[in-house]
Amino acid sequence: MGTRATTICSLFFLLWVLAEPAENSDFYLPGDYLLGGLFSLHANMKGIVHLNFLQVPMCKEYEVKVIGYNLMQAMRFAVEEINNDSSLLPGVLLGYEIVDVCYISNNVQPVLYFLAHEDNLLPIQEDYSNYISRVVAVIGPDNSESVMTVANFLSLFLLPQITYSAISDELQDKVRFPALLRTTPSADHHVEAMVQLMLHFRWNWIIVLVSSDTYGRDNGQLLGERLARRDICIAFQETLPTLQPNQNMTSEERQRLVTIVDKLQQSTARVVVVFSPDLSLYDFFNEVLRQNFTGAVWIASESWAIDPVLHNLTELRHLGTFLGITIQSVPIPGFSEFREWSPQAGPPPLSRTSQSYTCNQECDNCLNATLSFNTILRLSGERVVYSVYSAVYAVAHALHSLLGCDNSTCTKRVVYPWQLLEEIWKVNFTLLDHQIFFDPQGDVALHLEIVQWQWDRSQNPFQSVASYYPLQRQLKHIQDISWHTINNTIPVSMCSKRCQSGQKKKPVGIHVCCFECIDCLPGTFLNHTEDEYECQACPNNEWSYQSETSCFKRQLVFLEWHEAPTIAVALLAALGFLSTLAILVIFWRHFQTPIVRSAGGPMCFLMLTLLLVAYMVVPVYVGPPKVSTCLCRQALFPLCFTICISCIAVRSFQIVCAFKMASRFPRAYSYWVRYQGPYVSMAFITVLKMVIVVIGMLATGLSPTTRTDPDDPKITIVSCNPNYRNSLLFNTSLDLLLSVVGFSFAYMGKELPTNYNEAKFITLSMTFYFTSSVSLCTFMSAYSGVLVTIVDLLVTVLNLLAISLGYFGPKCYMILFYPERNTPAYFNSMIQGYTMRRD
């Protein structure tokens, strides 16, 4: 036999064993089409699927489950309301057969009973397309584990099953459960609502408690995965112990509860999420009360979010704030009154004692127990009740379509389960202002609500404080919550406080929520969107202060005209330019005089012209550097200055040669004069300087560069030569050598005739240049920044002034104030006197 035949044989055997005469029950309403109902009217403390036992458990031996009876009444109310409606199923009587599954203890026997014929036989067939079961659809049961058990049977027959509160995401697998639908959002939405609640209140340090069954494990795992994506950490997760049926808690289980509550006390987390059936929580909360663990926020899963019996433990109000995730409340007119006057479940009528029936269809204490909670049930509103109510109406609308009903009649005919299933998938109707239809996963998109537990008898015990919409996956309409804290402040549940702006996180331990906050150093910033654990360096042209989230442009610093040092240097340069120009005019007017000729004659005009050009180069030091200004700084000015110094050095050498070396080396002196020695020397020096300048420009380039001021990193110094310090000695080496040579020859000519003795003036100029250059190098080794540029420019101008005024100034003074000394006769007399002294 195939797998299908083997499965059917197993079902037949189980049905033969379990279908014995059962206890009396009247959870039955005859009709043309019967609905099966599976509800937990009783519950044990730890459900066991009794596949290994030959005897069906007696549910009445367990405690009454008020919510289960309330949901059963919702099914009965919906069926009676439909039967009284002349338009939905006119002429058709809808009936029901309800069985108590006592949570997860009794699922197999009822489903076999629903699948069997009236004679309690389930025949083995190759094709069940034309098979007629006892019921056309099943409503329930209430939890995911039971739903899977039932669905595995019903799916073989494609008998429609609509669950009203099972949320497991596994139930969306339509390959495994093709006949299963539900009128409640999936666990994915329940967990998402919890996570968005935590995000809204910035709780990222959470405790998770789960039950030891499939419900707790699966939802705890789903929550953990979802929290990890949102950087919410689980401080610890524990499994709550539960009791065996009709057994007291063992010492090991009690010690386990004590240990869990001890961990709650020691943890810094103050938000506790509990995924567990209500049955597992009574002993747990009693232990919490005993240890007086207070100040926490308890987030309840839908299994106990609106449980009236657990809410009846009024001492829970002292433990903290209780929030729950549950389905929306939809008022059902007339239901509260129906629940209150429903007759007590009694023995079955005599007309049915000869027919087939099943066990677990009685609940002697259900009505009394429910009435004792009637106030809280009435104030809390119809939540899961509406899910049952809409499930029954979904079947009724499918029958309406399948039977071809109009406003007055329906065509009664045989309804096969697979036919009804197809129509249920198609239903789309409005029920109490809510649209009911099934999405591709078989779910109805009713929105969820966040409820807060209240113990004020005048208020709703489960007050809605927010709504979650599955289609938008958004938490909205968040209202004020009454926190059990001082001044009603929002509780804080964070492993580490949020870092301030511009602080990076340094992980502490294994949890991403536990960290130290460290300020980002200057020059770095924190980009929260990319990396919260590392500060990023600012770009080269930007800077930041400590603890910044962005960088700002560095201030570009260069010499500007409005600055006082620049103005002072510019005035000196203007003074030098004007004085040099005046000297040039004076020398031009007295070109043929002995003083001008002794100073060098045409060579003086070359020097003065180059000095004027050098003064005109001074303005290029001011303002942002460009390629053209850098060319002037690095090429034009050094050439001008070097030629001036070379003229002085050559002139000093020429005078010494004329008076001291001509007689000793007449031949050499004649070559010097004949082949224009001074000009050849100056040309050689000029070419050598040009080579030095070109090498320097090739090494450093002409493009302006930027560098950070080491004393003030927010400042960027714009300069022409990035390696100015290193190249300064190389660029000035020739000038320093010429100054030493000029000084030496001037010193050698200190005994020459007064009119030719320029030792004092050349010594002044050359000594000043040498000293200033050495001082500039020393200054640059100690300081940096734009101050170096200012000092460099100042030294340059002073060196030019030293030549203009120190070398040419005394000669102008003699020309203007002692004209009698500017005659050939005077010069000849001075030469004769020098000659006589030597003799």
Swiss-Prot record:
Extracellular side: 20-566, 624-635, 703-727, 782-784
SUPFAM superfamilies assigned to the protein according to its UniProt record, in alphabetical order: Periplasmic binding protein-like I
Underlying gene: TAS1R2
Cytoplasmic topological domain: 588-602, 657-681, 749-760, 806-839
Pfam families noted in UniProt: 7tm_3, ANF_receptor, NCD3G
InterPro entries xrefs: ANF_lig-bd_rcpt, GPCR_3, GPCR_3_9-Cys_dom, GPCR_3_9-Cys_sf, GPCR_3_C, GPCR_3_Ca_sens_rcpt-rel, GPCR_3_CS, Peripla_BP_I
Keywords: Cell membrane, G-protein coupled receptor, Glycoprotein, Membrane, Receptor, Sensory transduction, Signal, Taste, Transducer, Transmembrane, Transmembrane helix
Annotated localization: Cell membrane
Glycan attachment positions: 84, 248, 292, 312, 368, 407, 428, 487, 527
Native source organism of the sequence: Gorilla gorilla gorilla (Western lowland gorilla)
Lineage of source species: Eukaryota, Metazoa, Chordata, Craniata, Vertebrata
One GO term of the biological process aspect: sensory perception of taste
Protein name in the entry: Taste receptor type 1 member 2
